[in-house]
Amino acid sequence: MAKAGVMTLSHVDRMNLRTWTMAIACCLLSFVNIVVFSVAAHFPGIGFPCYYPRIIDFDNMNLTMYNAIHHLTPQLFLDPVQLIVYVIFTELIFFCVLSYYIVCWVQIYFRSEHGTQVNQSTRDINFMGDSATCFTFVLTMDTFQIFLLSLSFRLPSMVAFSKCMYFMCLTAFVVTLVTHYESRERSAFALSKIHPKLQGTIRYRTAVVNLTQLILGFATMVLAMSLALGFGNSFFVKTAHVVFGAMVAFAIVACVYFSIIESVLSRYMKVQFGYHIGTILGVCGAMYPIIRYEALNASSYARDINIGITVLLLLCVAFSVIRTVRFLLRRNKRYRALALDNEEIRALRSDAE
């Protein structure tokens, strides 16, 4: 029998908790699958046609060369060491997200007191990351696995397509994890109604959001490189022009995401620096092949490429400074003036008169 003032699990809570448990189990299976897949891809004779990190031979790269039909034309991409580090780091972030979901599930599933409000568990699940968000995370991991498989088969068009799908799924996961499909006011109201024992877990949620934004920022540069790889091997274009096109694509996508963070997402969560750090790391990752390989460094286009990379880096740093300044200003704001045209204020004034 329930204690006085304490609610038991309702039918809605039980159904949502079961669905959420199944979603987290699917996340766990997908994570194990992608880890086993990425490890097996490093060993020959298991079924992978090529060693996926070596999709580009920088020694044969020529910026003045046009696309060679029916041959893989080298384009600007991550070198083997960078690609392996990128895969490992991405999977570590996936592990952190999965750990966050498991911690939330343990705290909600095994707690003795379910709260004093109706459907308290449903409220908590929706705020911490509901079943739809979990399934979006599953799609994110699955599309990343398809991206690695495309690299192994050395299919440039498929690499570009799978990277676009992964980028869109990761974007959807980040946005839904921040907004909960709700307005800022409803999200703030849901935060005030969660179970008291989950207050400390909110800090982990902030860290998870920033970590996923970090890989989203780096994935922006990988997306631009993947599009360049697919476009440069599908049309009769010069390699140097494809490199410049990748820079423009990165600048456009990054500016759009920076604007969304500043105008929309920052209202839901104050601490959001992950995407800014990720884009800076992505630009630095693009610098490494240009500096390391003589075929790129000695080209007549090297100066223009270096200028373009520098502009991209300054762009990311500028938006990072803007985010930092806005965060500090919002943090130091002690109060907010009430709007003079508020209906409640007008009603109070009329009553006073």
UniProtKB/Swiss-Prot annotation:
Its main location: virion. Keywords: Disulfide bond, Glycoprotein, Host endosome, Host Golgi apparatus, Host membrane, Host nucleus, Membrane, Transmembrane, Transmembrane helix, Viral envelope protein, Virion. The keyword Transmembrane applies. It is found in: Virion membrane; Host Golgi apparatus, Host trans-Golgi network; Host endosome membrane; Host nucleus inner membrane. It holds the Pfam family Herpes_glycop. Coiled coil: none annotated. It is a multi-pass membrane protein. Residues 49-82, 154-157, 232-240, 292-304 are virion surface. One of its GO terms (cellular component) is viral envelope. Residues 1-27, 104-132, 179-210, 262-270, 326-353 are intravirion. The chain crosses the membrane at residues 28-48, 83-103, 133-153, 158-178, 211-231, 241-261, 271-291, 305-325. InterPro entries: Herpes_glycop_M. Interacts (via N-terminus) with gN (via N-terminus). The gM-gN heterodimer forms the gCII complex. Envelope glycoprotein important for virion assembly and egress. Plays a role in the correct incorporation of gH-gL into virion membrane. Directs the glycoprotein N (gN) to the host trans-Golgi network. Belongs to the herpesviridae glycoprotein M family. HAMAP family: HSV_GM. This is Envelope glycoprotein M. It comes from Murid herpesvirus 1 (strain K181) (MuHV-1). The lineage of its organism: Viruses, Duplodnaviria, Heunggongvirae, Peploviricota, Herviviricetes.
